[in-house]
């Protein structure tokens, strides 16, 4: 059994990318998969279950009074392609630590024997947060392969670099490795070249470039993956290619995160960030505009 995790900046399309890819892995390649959603939004399994947010382990545990009183079939639901789906959940906003929900859920699943008869367990983890709780799949050596969903946008690349730092921190203590960057395209100029360059500097690969296509949104509105909604579409073939690459991936590395100066140099090189001279010109132009407005 292989345990993988998808990380990435909030809003990058991580849950969408992971569910579409896992659907292809299960439906086309017969992989037995369990998804463990590690995001308090509980949206990591929606497209697989064709449903609204799934009832979470923490929610049921709160109703029962203790996680020991939860039955496995209350929180583990089968979905498209026979994929088993679980959402860890989290506390009310502003109260407690959502990371504890992940720890509680994983321990519960292990004790209930949910990890048997599987080829893959996939953890879908909140945004770019690599604090203790959200890093739990990495820290406790649960997830052995980390896939970072990113794009050619500046903040997505910052997040990818930060996540690589988190992987590096635990790589020597455990067996966690970086499996690659998945570029979920935002149609940025020279995006493929940029992410390939970033991947090389991080000592990894751009495992796949997922083009932008409106069929993904059309499927999402129906709470489906593209694999279920339009299996003959070109986009379904893209997710299938990514699925095959993950199944066959042997390039698992210890990342070499960039220093901030190095990352900024890369962004400047590709025109995503101006150099110091450009920055000073921007500031001067803004100051002039403010003064002109004030003088009216």
From Swiss-Prot:
One of its GO terms (molecular function) is metal ion binding. This is Nitrogenase iron protein. Its EC number is 1.18.6.1. The modification ADP-ribosylarginine is found at residue 100. GO terms for biological process: nitrogen fixation. InterPro entries: NifH/chlL_CS, NifH/frxC, Nitrogenase_Fe_NifH, P-loop_NTPase. NCBIfam families: nifH. Binds 1 [4Fe-4S] cluster per dimer. Keywords: 4Fe-4S, ADP-ribosylation, ATP-binding, Iron, Iron-sulfur, Metal-binding, Nitrogen fixation, Nucleotide-binding, Oxidoreductase. It comes from Trichodesmium erythraeum (strain IMS101).
């Amino acid at each position: 059994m292989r345990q993988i995790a998808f990380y990435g900046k909030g809003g990058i399309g991580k849950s969408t990318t992971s569910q579409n890819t896992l659907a292809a892995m299960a439906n086309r390649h017969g992989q037995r998969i369990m998804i463990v959603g590690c995001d308090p939004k509980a949206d990591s399994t929606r497209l697989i279950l064709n449903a609204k947010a799934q009832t979470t382990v923490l929610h049921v545990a709160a109703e029962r009074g203790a996680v020991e009183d939860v039955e496995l079939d209350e929180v583990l639901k089968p979905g498209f392609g026979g994929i088993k789906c679980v959402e860890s959940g989290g506390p009310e906003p502003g109260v407690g630590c959502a990371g504890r929900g992940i720890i509680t859920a994983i321990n519960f699943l292990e004790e209930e024997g949910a990890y048997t008869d599987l080829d893959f367990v996939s953890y879908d983890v909140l945004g770019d947060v690599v604090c203790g709780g959200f890093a739990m799949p990495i820290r406790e050596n649960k997830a052995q392969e980390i896939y970072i969903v990113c794009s050619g946008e500046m903040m997505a690349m910052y997040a990818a670099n930060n996540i690589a730092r988190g992987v590096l921190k635990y790589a020597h203590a455990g067996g966690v490795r970086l499996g690659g960057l998945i570029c979920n395209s935002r149609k940025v100029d020279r995006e493929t070249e940029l992410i390939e360059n970033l991947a090389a500097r991080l000592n990894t690969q751009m495992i796949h470039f997922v083009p932008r296509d409106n069929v993904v949104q059309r499927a999402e509105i129906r709470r489906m993956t593209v694999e279920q909604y339009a299996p003959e579409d070109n986009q379904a073939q893209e997710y299938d290619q990514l699925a095959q690459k993950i199944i066959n991936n042997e390039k698992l590395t210890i990342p070499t995160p960039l220093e901030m100066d190095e990352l900024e140099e890369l962004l400047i090189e590709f025109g995503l960030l101006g150099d110091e001279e450009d920055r000073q010109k921007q500031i001067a132009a803004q100051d002039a505009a403010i003064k002109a407005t004030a003088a009216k």
